[in-house]
Amino acid sequence: MARRGRRSLASPAVAIALFVFLAYGGGGGGGGVCEAAPASAVVKSVPGFDGALPSKHYAGYVTVEEQHGRNLFYYLVESERDPAKDPLVLWLNGGPGCSSFDGFVYEHGPFNFESGGSAKSLPKLHLNPYSWSKVSSVIYLDSPAGVGLSYSKNTSDYNTGDLKTAADSHTFLLKWFQLYPEFLSNPFYIAGESYAGVYVPTLSHEVVKGLHDGVKPTINFKGYMVGNGVCDTVFDGNALVPFAHGMALISDDIYQEAQTACHGNYWNTTTDKCENALYKVDTSINDLNIYDILEPCYHSKTIKKVTPANTKLPKSFQHLGTTTKPLAVRTRMHGRAWPLRAPVRAGRVPSWQEFARGSRPSGVPCMSDEVATAWLNNDDVRAAIHAQPVSSIGSWLICTNVLDFIHDAGSMISYHKNLTGQGYRAFIYSGDHDMCVPYTGTEAWTRSLGYGVIDSWRPWHLNGQVSGYTQGYEHGLTFATIKGAGHTVPEYKPQESLAFYSRWLAGSKL
């Protein structure tokens, strides 16, 4: 079947366009910066949104491997402020295997998405006042191939892992900057959440290695951000029990029994006594929404929706998760991390469908991605954003079921130490009510790097209110929490997220 995607990077049309731009210095115009971008990448309008786009948008494919036809899909949102000077940020969602349109649709993209009324009807789009494109240009990348709208003509490419994903994403960046050379002078950052706690440091490592090796084009890489990200088997695996105790989800007796039986080692149980103690922990928290313990958990359409008033949350928590988001937080929290007490381990990573079958007969709880699914599987939307049609590459899924993924990068501790040791800035943040990748583990591993504290633990504020807590270290490392937020921080606390994002990019203290 004929494909409707963009021409490959090697096409004469693109080569001529780049030559003309470089030879004659094509400048900005019309409020944007991308004058060299191929015309086939321009997004003129998006179905579901009435009115002019708030900035220039571009989308399409970059072929990272010609022989196999391995193509990664991106969506670029130019900064609404000053795209010629503002930072450029690559955004990656996790999984592994989950689409970065998760971030575009539900978190910090240019639009807020409102359901069209049924599962297949086109959603209504409204401008997002807290979009991260207010202060930066953002590239949303579906990676690796097989995720979201990215694909390969050779399905053997869907057998992949951390290191291959990082290499492909680096190839993507090098080719992308050839298409958009205007951005080479902009400060460039890599950001992501959840399993992107692996994607971000490994890709950052590839970029820095390329800079050391003199690879062209030269990327103006400055640093990276990780939100509620996985990092290390031990730190991640031991985080849940102290978190649950600190949040009053388990009693002192249960906590002390687990401590005594497991000797503080909760992730790799070796005795029946420890396993029995952890079973009591799991039983106490099993009905909560692990991605945000403040949010109701919807198990399926056949089960009546619950409210915070009849969950196991202490009454004092019931209003902590209030949000300024104009539309309701989605009812699904599946797709970006792990089941309880299942830290990242070396070797093959189970697919989300396998996790679902292994956890509950009805599938993974707290899930409903109808808005994103309806929009991204609409034929007009696919055409508008230059994505291959459903008839060609299949339906968009929030998390793919085609990957056979290997975690082969090991602990991220050494990556963080290496990158920050070379002077690259790092912002590590946690929604403090995420039980999937709890802040307790993240705070512990950032502290374990051994850097001196230069900004002692303190609250950070927005509009005169405490929005979370932060601690700054040597070598440009910052740890921060966001009060009342879950696993996908901008989804719950969009205003606070734009605040910490813009402050950190500007080099200001939170």
Curated annotation (Swiss-Prot):
Regions crossing the membrane: none
PROSITE patterns: CARBOXYPEPT_SER_HIS (PS00560), CARBOXYPEPT_SER_SER (PS00131)
Enzyme Commission (EC) number: 3.4.16.5
Segment forming the signal sequence: 1-25
List of catalytic residues: S194, D434, H487
Known glycosylation sites: N154, N268, N418
Propeptide, residue positions: 26-36, 303-362
Presence of the UniProt keyword Chaperone in the record: no
Keywords: Carboxypeptidase, Disulfide bond, Glycoprotein, Hydrolase, Protease, Signal, Zymogen
GO MF term set: acyltransferase activity, transferring groups other than amino-acyl groups; serine-type carboxypeptidase activity
GO biological process, one term: secondary metabolic process
Motif (Microbody targeting signal): 508-510
Cysteine-cysteine disulfides: C98-C399, C262-C274, C297-C366
EC class name: hydrolase
Key word Signal present: yes
Enzymatic reactions: Release of a C-terminal amino acid with broad specificity
Similarity field: Belongs to the peptidase S10 family.
Record-given protein name: Serine carboxypeptidase 1
Organism: Oryza sativa subsp. japonica
